[in-house]
Amino acid sequence: MSTSKSENYLSELRKIIWPIEQHENKKFLPLAFMMFCILLNYSTLRSIKDGFVVTDIGTESISFLKTYIVLPSAVIAMVIYVKLCDILKQENIFYVITSFFLGYFALFAFVLYPYPDLVHPDHKTIESLSLAYPNFKWFIKIVGKWSFASFYTIAELWGTMMLSLLFWQFANQITKITEAKRFYSMFGLLANLALPVTSVVIGYFLHEKTQIVSEHLKFIPLFVIMITSSFLIILTYRWMNKNVLTDPRLYDPTLVKEKKAKAKLSFIESFKMIFTSKYVGYIALLIIAYGVSVNLVEGVWKSKVKELYPTKEAYTIYMGQFQFYQGWVAIAFMLIGSNILRKVSWLTAAMITPLMMFITGAAFFSFIFFDSVIAMNLTGILASSPLTLAVMFGMIQNVLSKGVKYSLFDATKNMAYIPLDKDLRVKGQAAVEVIGGRLGKSGGAIIQSTFFILFPAFGFIEATPYFASIFFIIVILWIFAVKGLNKEYQVLVNKNEN
């Protein structure tokens, strides 16, 4: 009897630690490996792209890249994807897009990166044009280092195309609903484990003691890893199509039904929906406020990171460390987030994100505005300079804001849709995706880039007081929006219960 109980206990423990059935490993493990490779590239690209742009062009250029290059490129990429869907089958689309990224990584690694003087315009010409046209100097500087700008854009598109679109489309196609409940939680843990691995890889290859290649080509091994990873993604995808999608135990094509088209609204229709429904408007305001406030702090923080770590290698190593902490904090929030939601009210759970942003943002900006006071009173005690402390608090703010997003912010936002009637829920969510998604991601960059165009003599140092003021105004509006949405939410919940 005791043996039977012990076996049952071990069986239950195994289901908690590894909820995948033995026969499902053939499907889950290659899918998980694909996701790991995609995320290894994703987190490596995120660390490197800023290192090139910030140190060679300037931190201010990031807002211009996001607004005027990345956003249009994402739209063009989606148009091309839709066209490919009309002429190729899904498997071949995956090969075409992944091969495009692989080809670009090879081109950048062996041509654009090693020979910048051959591909970039003359530095003196760019400087003279920047002085002649100060309002457009950041556009001119971006053109002057166009290969780094293209790398930044491709890095941004990798996350959108490879992870959000191709991987999840494939996973959703071949994963049954009963499997998804167990598979997807494990994917979440795996996704965040790729971040610490990236940190270790970057730290090793860019360390000054690692002498695999010449000093001016330190990034080559990282590019080779990304190229290899891209090859492995293609090979794994091919193997799954040959061995998993042909196994009736793991995939039944008759169960793949045509899904009803999601409600799609135009930009104008989305605006009308948000302005005519106070409830939907509040949800949109939450998403916009999150995106804009994160971008405003992130821009200032990266300018301070550049001051502390002025070289490409040092900056990239630091961003790798940032990914390390972000990965573990995200895992921690994933584990505790569901418990928080079960034990507190919707209002309390929804308030955690803006209050955390306000407190950490206030600490970050305090170390910038009062650096001389801190230097006199705290530097000796804390054995750190005001700049180091500002960078540290900026990292804490960014790590927490991204960690809390996936566990609490997204969960409370999605809960807010539940009490709505079906028509408003479907159309409202579509409207929020169009307006909130676009303005949230690009809103902060638009504010910053417009500011630098109107005031060309300003950099982040001079503009920080203005960006800080906008940040606090937006977070306060966010808090009021949460309170307003909670009132509407409680009315609908009580109405539905009665």
Swiss-Prot record:
UniProt keyword list: ATP-binding, Cell membrane, Disulfide bond, Membrane, Nucleotide-binding, Transmembrane, Transmembrane helix, Transport
Transmembrane segments: 34-54, 68-88, 93-113, 148-168, 185-205, 219-239, 280-300, 321-341, 349-369, 380-400, 439-459, 466-486
Coiled coil: none
NCBIfam families reported for this sequence: AAA
Function in brief: Provides the rickettsial cell with host ATP in exchange for rickettsial ADP. This is an obligate exchange system. This energy acquiring activity is an important component of rickettsial parasitism.
Signal peptide segment: none
Record family assignment: Belongs to the ADP/ATP translocase tlc family.
Positions in the Cytoplasmic compartment: 1-33, 89-92, 169-184, 240-279, 342-348, 401-438, 487-498
Membrane topology: Multi-pass membrane protein
Positions with a binding annotation for ATP: 436-442
Residue pairs linked by disulfide bridges in the UniProt entry: 37-85
Alphabetized SUPFAM superfamilies for the sequence: MFS general substrate transporter
InterPro entries referenced in this protein's UniProt entry, alphabetically: ADP_ATP_car_bac_type, MFS_trans_sf
Keyword Ligase in annotation: no
Classification via Pfam families: TLC
Extracellular side: 55-67, 114-147, 206-218, 301-320, 370-379, 460-465
Entry superkingdom: Bacteria
GO cellular component terms listed in the entry, alphabetical order: plasma membrane
This protein's name: ADP,ATP carrier protein 1
GO molecular function: ATP binding; ATP:ADP antiporter activity
Keyword Membrane in record: yes
Lineage: Bacteria, Pseudomonadati, Pseudomonadota, Alphaproteobacteria, Rickettsiales
Localization (cell): Cell membrane
